[in-house]
Regions:
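N-terminal subdomain of nucleotide-sugar transferases
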Residues: 2-65, 182
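Membrane-proximal helix-turn-helix segments that form the acceptor-binding/catalytic region
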Residues: 90-93, 117, 124-128, 139-144, ...
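Conserved catalytic-core segment of nucleotide-activated headgroup transferases in glycan assembly
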Residues: 207-265
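Short N-terminal targeting/anchoring amphipathic segment
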Residues: 100-118, 131-134, 138
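Nucleotide-sugar-dependent
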Residues: 23, 234-237, 264-270, 278-298, ...
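A charged, aromatic-enriched C-terminal amphipathic alpha-helix characteristic of glycosyltransferases
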Residues: 328-335, 343-373
């Protein structure tokens, strides 16, 4: 069954998301909002109040405060949410009250989320106002064993409750997935996982911002392998392997994580273009995790070394785009690094002969789906 095609007169979208927090400020959500604005839609982003919204935007943002800021308030409301889904219920109620008559003028609710919040709130808003609900699922608990990607930031004393929280969250999430009119998500693995709950699911890859991530030959006096992004426990074995190989070859690895040597968002493009190789770390324990840095390196046509191969969506995309290699084989890794080092010695830069690159620009990805479905 195909996803329902909305009338072409639809112009007013209420986009609901979790808070756009630093440092990235939810690039997928922001780019979706800007895409629809550029296409002539009236867009309002509805989200929870959480710090400063320190990014440029051409659409109104409505924020709702849910917590007072005290630890006690957070604890009580977290427990109450576990028992009653307070977070989603209260957010929806406040949203309808705050927006009042304006909220009924929207034609569709589009909710982008990585967790069960604000999926439940968006469902309540759409159901109460009799509007279609589209869900954009950025992450799933099941994509990493034990949900270590989802809950790595939780404090130590919450760990014993993680299994219970996860089970409740998944049940609430799946209830919304079944009710959605259409769903988009980030990889073929995610599509296959969601399809039993709702057949109207399609992949819209995260892609890259073509205005920031584009090919440009920049000569450097140093060949480096660059890693940019968060570093989780399940990625560290792969990192240690590459570090040992690079050390044997006398090549440096520059690590840029949110905690150590972070790179400002507007400087990411040049940082990638100055790299000899972009390192992507994954694990066979993960499913469908297509890191944004893969797309950004693809946009800049920089060679990608993915260690190990996830033997799934990421390895398939790297092969499809000829963006580099995905492997755990030490000799393949050494050969790949040596070849790129020799290319740098000859030219002063590296450049990957990619394929299908333009189709993974964000606007191209959004056009492929939303131009016919909204």
């Amino acid at each position: 069954m195909m996803a329902p095609i909305m009338p072409r007169c639809m112009k007013r979208l209420l986009i609901v998301s979790d808070p756009p927090a630093a440092p990235g400020y939810l690039p997928r959500v922001r780019s979706l909002c800007e895409y629809f604005v550029q296409k002539g839609y009236e867009v309002t982003l509805l989200t929870e109040e959480y710090g400063d919204l320190a990014f440029a935007h051409s659409y109104p943002i409505e924020t709702i405060r849910m917590y007072s800021g005290s630890t006690f308030d957070w604890f009580i409301k977290t427990v109450w949410t576990l028992l009653t889904d307070w977070h989603n219920r209260a957010f929806a109620k406040k949203a309808i009250y705050n927006l009042q008559s304006a909220i009924s003028n929207y034609d569709l609710v589009l909710c982008s989320a990585f967790s069960d919040f604000p999926l439940g709130a968006a469902r309540r808003i759409a159901k109460g106002l009799k509007m279609p609900l589209y869900c954009d699922i950025r992450d799933l608990d099941e994509q990493v064993e034990d949900s270590t990607y989802q809950y790595h930031h939780r404090t130590w004393w919450t760990m014993p409750f993680r299994r219970l929280y996860r089970a409740i969250h998944i049940r609430r999430r799946n209830k919304v997935l079944r009710a959605a009119d259409a769903i988009t998500t980030v990889s073929p693995w995610h599509v296959d996982f969601i399809r039993p709950f709702n057949p109207n699911v399609s992949v819209v890859y995260n892609g890259y911002d073509a205005a920031q991530f584009y090919p440009k030959n920049i000569k450097t006096n140093r060949f480096i392998i660059t890693y940019i992004g968060s570093l989780f426990e399940w990625q560290k074995p792969a990192l240690h392997k590459v570090q040992q190989i690079a050390q044997e070859l006398g090549i440096a690895i520059d690590l840029h994580t949110p905690q150590n040597h972070p790179i400002a968002h507007d400087a990411l493009g040049d940082a990638i273009r100055r790299s000899g190789i972009m390192l992507v770390l994954t694990s066979e324990r993960t499913h469908g995790m297509l890191t944004t840095k893969f797309y950004e390196a693809l946009g800049c046509e920089k060679p990608i070394l993915c260690v190990p191969s996830d033997k799934g969506s990421l390895a398939e995309l790297i092969a499809y785009t000829n963006a580099g290699i995905a492997t755990d084989d030490v000799e393949y890794i050494k050969t790949f690094i040596r070849e790129r080092f020799e290319e740098w010695q000859q030219n002063g830069f590296t450049r990957q002969a990619t394929q299908h690159r333009e189709s993974f620009a964000r606007e191209a990805q959004y056009d492929q789906y939303y131009s016919t479905h909204i």
